[in-house]
């Protein structure tokens, strides 16, 4: 047994050291595929974990919380909450975002918490280090002081006693550092990068006297939590939500799961392409050592041992590649965390950039385990077919003169029938409904499409050799006889060359499919922006571009500004646009209120049926709403039906007058008239003021007048953002483009792995054909002609991969747009085929193939003829 194991190890070492280039190419391919998958998984987990950690730390000992959505909670509710049975403590909380207005960190958003500092110090995982020389109680409660987390103070270069300026609710406010927050744990904490004030001081700062963001409730351990929840629901207004703090994390996970699943699936493409690379590597090993395998079989090595030999080699490649990919994946995840958190913040919910900071050591071991597992699985799957083929080698045929591989014929009709069956299955899967809101069958349909095209690859390669031609055709056309020899050689090995073409095809198809989807989506969004963003300019809070990273107080302006803005010369009309989230049939939905009659005159919504102006006036006259396509599908409603909206006065049933296309959020939105909104919610604030100018008005002059008017009439107000129509459109499209940066990174990795596959194929093909190439040189072929021969073969493989990649990419784009995107987010996208992108993809494939073939071609041309003919 020991001798057998030693012999086995010797054979493995010999095989690995004989062809180091091929081994390194395979290792690199596996490592890159594992790296992409580990990086995305780690970044996704870390971002959600940071949000969960923030919720848990801030909640402290609270077991329930009372929320009022974007409009907050009236502090008089505290008395009713405190009176509920089983409640032992009631903790008011204000949580808002503010923006730094000075220094190198100008424009950076940070979370500010307003808490009852007298009653809560030491209960939430932090302690205060106050400044000296000032009355402790006065310092604790002053409205112009704040406590900073240690990391935040370090980043902003502030010390105890320092003064700094921030933007709060459209006002410039000067605060001074009363002290630092010290956490009671060594790990990263939300308090390290947060700001803290007393609850009363925070209410003054945010001009929200009597309002809270939420009320946290501490309950008795011996009292059933469900009974306390029921008592609170009975005692409080129906527009208030009572939930456990952990539910916020679950809600965020529910919102982002489609986004994270789509990104994760895309990261697995590298693994899929890596599987083909391993298949090729092991298949070439088997082909090159076929005679050696025949000797092993003749000497008594069992089929199982032969298969185990090659599977072990693949397993070693997978383990080593998995280790390297796991380590580099964690390093890459450190850069992707900020990208993922920014995308989630843009589209869903604010994720503090300070919290989403990865610890390399924390993730290393789990990443290594994941990497080794993925690498081993990918390698074993890729090596399974070639290993079985090796184990079934017939010793007599392998030891006989001639090419064993040429005598093996592929069952092409079987490949054709399989491809047809997979295409049919893909079509059926595309028609099925999503599972739990996720396009599972859509992903399976894409897998079937790629598998079907992979089955066509060997058929297409062998078809090259059956093209009818006359003898003189060998001398005609580009490349002449060299081109025909290259085609003939490629056609002699449809199996393993088909694997190479499939790898390139998959990488290219994914790239084309995603690019066509993104371009179609962008063009649809551009059309939507051009049709709906009509206002000449928008007046917004200075922190508005930070989106939901800042709170409602920093994203709202006084409604009284409308009259002041309307009085400015050159201004024809001013709309009042308010954006809040409210409860609709148990779900959080974006509610837009504005002057619908003015909007009907000046702008439009892309209504699915009917005329925009008519529908807007009808909504204003009847007290109805317009709902977005996404929301209508999500709630299962349509025009003519009613929708239940929870308001401070109770649940209101509102008629739906129209559906419209909207691409601002994947959660959907509804639009109502501002007068109706104010009557129901008693909220006079405005998110932005869309401004319509007189014909011929000077945009620059009006912009200056707006800033002067606001600064002159409002004390301490920060200059608002005045954004022109062109700037607003550009900002919308910039946000769109940011969301797909991660997609492009993953595509590039998949295509690069496919290029490694071409290089691996050509390197091994050159090694296998040393005698053939040496014979050509011996009868007069020049080194240049040998190089051209290899490059022609590379070009044919690249061209075939490009053709199949374009076909697969277009089919994939249809599934992405019509099935996966529709089921994931609900948007209707008008598909457009960018011909320029397809041409670029073909050029990329050919260029990549030629680049990959250059080194093998050069190496083949420089090999000594004598060594190549030695066995002859």
Named regions from a protein language model:
Residues 1-872:
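Alpha-helical transmembrane segments of bacterial inner-membrane membrane proteins
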């Amino acid at each position: 047994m020991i001798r057998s194991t030693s012999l086995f190890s010797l054979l493995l070492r010999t095989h690995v050291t004989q062809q180091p280039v091929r081994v390194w190419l395979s290792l690199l391919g596996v490592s890159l595929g594992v790296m992409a998958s580990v990086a995305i998984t780690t970044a996704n987990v870390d971002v959600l974990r940071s949000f969960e950690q923030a919720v848990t730390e801030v909640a402290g000992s609270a077991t329930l919380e009372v929320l009022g959505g974007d409009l907050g909670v009236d502090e008089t509710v505290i008395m009713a909450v405190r009176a509920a049975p089983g409640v032992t403590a009631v903790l008011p909380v204000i949580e808002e975002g503010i923006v730094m207005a000075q220094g190198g960190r100008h424009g950076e958003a940070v979370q500010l918490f307003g808490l009852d500092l007298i009653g809560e110090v030491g209960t939430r995982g932090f302690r205060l280090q106050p400044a000296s020389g000032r009355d402790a109680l006065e310092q604790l409660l002053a409205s112009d002081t704040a406590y900073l987390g240690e990391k935040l103070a370090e980043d902003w270069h502030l010390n105890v006693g320092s003064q700094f300026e921030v933007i709060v609710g459209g006002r410039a406010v000067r605060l001074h550092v009363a002290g630092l927050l010290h956490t009671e744990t060594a790990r990263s904490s939300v308090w390290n990068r947060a700001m803290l004030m007393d609850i009363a001081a925070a209410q003054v700062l945010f001009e929200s006297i009597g309002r809270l963001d939420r009320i946290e409730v501490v309950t008795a351990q011996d009292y059933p939590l469900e009974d306390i929840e029921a008592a609170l629901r009975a005692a409080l207004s129906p527009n208030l939500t009572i939930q456990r703090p952990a539910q916020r994390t679950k809600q965020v996970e529910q919102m982002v799961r489609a986004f994270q699943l789509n990104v994760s699936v895309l990261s697995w493409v590298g693994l899929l392409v890596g599987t083909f690379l391993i298949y090729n590597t092991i298949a070439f090993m088997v082909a090159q050592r076929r005679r050696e395998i025949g000797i092993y079989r003749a000497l008594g090595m069992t089929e199982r041992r032969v298969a185990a030999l090659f599977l072990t080699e693949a397993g070693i490649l997978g383990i080593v590649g998995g280790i390297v990919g796991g380590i580099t994946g964690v390093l890459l995840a450190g850069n992707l965390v900020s990208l993922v958190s920014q995308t989630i913040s843009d589209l869903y919910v604010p994720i503090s950039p300070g919290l989403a900071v990865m610890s390399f050591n924390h993730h290393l071991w789990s990443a290594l385990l994941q990497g080794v597992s993925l690498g081993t699985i990918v390698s074993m799957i890729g090596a399974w077919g070639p290993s079985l083929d090796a184990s079934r080698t017939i010793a007599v045929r392998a030891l006989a003169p001639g090419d064993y591989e040429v005598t093996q014929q592929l069952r092409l009709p079987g490949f054709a029938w399989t491809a047809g069956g997979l295409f049919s299955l893909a079509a059926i899967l595309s028609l099925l409904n999503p599972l739990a809101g996720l396009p599972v069958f859509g992903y399976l349909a894409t897998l079937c499409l790629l598998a079907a095209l992979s089955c066509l690859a060997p058929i297409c390669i062998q078809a090259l050799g059956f093209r009818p031609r006359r003898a003189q055709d060998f001398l005609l056309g580009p490349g002449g006889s060299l081109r025909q020899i290259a085609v003939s050689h490629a056609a002699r090995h449809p199996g393993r060359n088909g694997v190479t073409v499939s790898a390139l095809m998959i990488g290219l198809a994914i790239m084309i499919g995603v690019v066509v989807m993104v371009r179609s989506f962008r063009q649809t969004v551009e059309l939507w922006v051009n049709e709906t963003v009509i206002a000449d300019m928008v007046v917004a809070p200075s922190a508005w571009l930070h989106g939901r990273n800042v709170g409602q107080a920093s994203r709202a302006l006084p409604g009284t500004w409308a009259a002041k803005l309307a009085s400015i010369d050159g201004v024809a009309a001013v709309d009042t646009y308010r954006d809040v989230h409210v409860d609709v049939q148990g779900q959080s939905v974006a509610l837009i209120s504005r002057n619908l009659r003015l909007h009907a005159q000046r702008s439009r919504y892309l209504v699915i049926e009917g005329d925009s102006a008519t529908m807007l006036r009808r909504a204003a006259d009847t007290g109805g709403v317009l709902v977005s396509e996404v929301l209508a599908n999500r709630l299962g409603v349509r025009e003519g039906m009613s929708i239940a909206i929870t308001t401070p006065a109770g649940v209101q049933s509102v008629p739906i007058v129209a559906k419209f296309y909207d691409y601002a959020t994947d959660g959907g939105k509804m639009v109502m008239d501002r007068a109706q909104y104010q009557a129901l919610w008693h909220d006079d604030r405005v998110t932005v003021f869309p401004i319509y100018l007189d014909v011929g008005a000077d945009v620059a002059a009006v912009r200056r007048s707006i800033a002067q008017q606001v600064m002159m009439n409002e004390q301490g107000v920060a200059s608002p953002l005045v954004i022109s129509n062109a700037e607003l459109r550009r900002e919308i499209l910039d946000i769109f483009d940011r969301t797909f940066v991660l997609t492009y990174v993953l595509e590039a990795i998949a295509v690069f792995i496919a290029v490694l596959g071409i290089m691996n194929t050509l390197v091994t093909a050159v090694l296998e054909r040393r005698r053939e190439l040496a014979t050509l040189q011996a009868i007069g072929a020049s080194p240049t002609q040998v190089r051209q021969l290899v490059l022609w073969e590379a070009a044919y493989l690249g061209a075939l991969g490009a053709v199949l990649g374009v076909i697969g990419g277009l089919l994939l784009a249809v599934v992405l747009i019509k099935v996966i995107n529709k089921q994931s987010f609900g948007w209707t996208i008008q598909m457009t085929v960018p011909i320029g992108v397809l041409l670029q993809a073909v050029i990329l494939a050919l260029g990549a193939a030629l680049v990959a073939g250059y080194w093998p071609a050069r190496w083949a041309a420089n090999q000594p003829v004598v060594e190549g003919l030695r066995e002859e």
